[in-house]
């Protein structure tokens, strides 16, 4: 038996459903026709349709998207949210979802990973898939909870439409030896934000020199012995030292250039010593760090 299609749907009702659901006009019209003009049932119809479409698009490649970074000073989070096309990545709906997503994660105030996104967030993602007609994936998600002695800095690069969504982002944690005061916190937070900028710009492989494997030193020494075998051991050691300094400058954050102050060149280590440790009269070290780019 064929079901009679309800066609007496007002334009006003269709527009109201469009505003409430964010779904395309044609989908709203079809939803109202399929539910005999019942607004609440039409909302549910669109929700179920969106979930079904999300399942169909799960296998689609997602090579575009945004990076979002955010902190409420207790938790810092950095996420990569992917979609299929650059066009969708710049829509207000996608940027709003990405912004609300990262803020929800941060305000839950717990360590998080992509594997334990709660069902509410996942349902919202699926609904957006139905609206935008593209697969949307949380590609990378990390959240960190501050300790009583640490502060976070965050940075977003190339922000889109005045949001916290961009093409790159970073999080840097600074840790003190003694407990924080309000004054210390304010100074360190500014420093952490500055370091987040440089961390994304420099993209170091290591934070500190001691993290570099002895294998790297051995490899450089072997290369020098092979290339400069005719030179004395003292000369070779001098060359090794120079090559290691270059390696550290290229790969180790503490030895890289703090490029935000071109008038007074200094390394990250020197910046932390002069601008942070001397000012707050306390030892400061870099803790958890992460950067992501599209």
UniProtKB/Swiss-Prot annotation:
Additional remarks: This protein may be expected to contain an N-terminal transit peptide but none has been predicted.
UniProt-annotated location(s): Mitochondrion
GO biological-process terms attached to the record: mitochondrial translational elongation
Disulphide-bridged cysteine pairs: none
InterPro entries membership: EF-Ts_dimer_sf (IPR036402), Transl_elong_EFTs/EF1B (IPR001816), Transl_elong_EFTs/EF1B_dimer (IPR014039), Transl_elong_Ts_CS (IPR018101), UBA-like_sf (IPR009060)
Keyword terms, alphabetized: Elongation factor, Mitochondrion, Protein biosynthesis
HAMAP family: EF_Ts
Functional note: Associates with the EF-Tu.GDP complex and induces the exchange of GDP to GTP. It remains bound to the aminoacyl-tRNA.EF-Tu.GTP complex up to the GTP hydrolysis stage on the ribosome.
Protein family according to the UniProt entry: Belongs to the EF-Ts family.
A cellular component term, taken from the record's GO annotations: mitochondrion
Protein name: Elongation factor Ts, mitochondrial 2
Protein's organism: Paramecium tetraurelia
A molecular-function term among this protein's GO annotations: translation elongation factor activity
């Amino acid at each position: 038996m064929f079901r009679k299609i309800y066609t007496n749907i007002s334009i006003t009702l269709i527009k109201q459903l469009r505003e409430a659901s964010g779904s395309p006009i044609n989908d709203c019209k079809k939803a109202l026709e399929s539910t005999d003009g019942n607004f609440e049932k039409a909302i549910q119809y669109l929700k179920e349709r969106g979930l079904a479409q999300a399942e169909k698009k799960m296998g689609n490649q997602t090579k575009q998207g945004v990076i979002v970074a955010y902190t409420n000073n207790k938790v810092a989070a950095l996420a990569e949210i992917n979609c299929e096309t650059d066009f969708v990545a710049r829509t207000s709906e996608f940027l709003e979802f990405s912004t609300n997503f990262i803020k929800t994660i941060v305000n839950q105030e717990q360590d998080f990973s992509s594997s334990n996104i709660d069902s509410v967030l996942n349902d919202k993602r699926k609904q957006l898939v139905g609206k935008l007609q593209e697969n949307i994936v949380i590609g990378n998600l990390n959240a960190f909870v501050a300790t009583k002695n640490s502060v976070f800095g965050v940075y977003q690069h190339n922000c889109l439409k005045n949001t916290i969504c961009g093409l790159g982002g970073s999080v840097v944690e600074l840790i003190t030896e003694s407990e924080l005061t309000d004054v210390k916190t304010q100074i360190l937070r500014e420093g952490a934000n500055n370091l987040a900028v440089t961390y994304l710009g420099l993209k170091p492989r290591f934070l500190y020199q001691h993290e570099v494997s002895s294998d790297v030193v051995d490899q450089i020494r072997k290369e020098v012995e092979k290339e400069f075998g005719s030179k004395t051991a003292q000369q070779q050691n001098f060359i090794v030292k120079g090559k290691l300094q270059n390696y550290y400058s290229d790969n180790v954050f503490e030895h890289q250039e703090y490029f935000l102050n071109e008038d007074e060149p200094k390394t990250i280590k020197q910046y932390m010593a002069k601008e942070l440790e001397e000012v707050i009269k306390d030892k400061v070290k870099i803790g958890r760090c992460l950067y992501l780019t599209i």
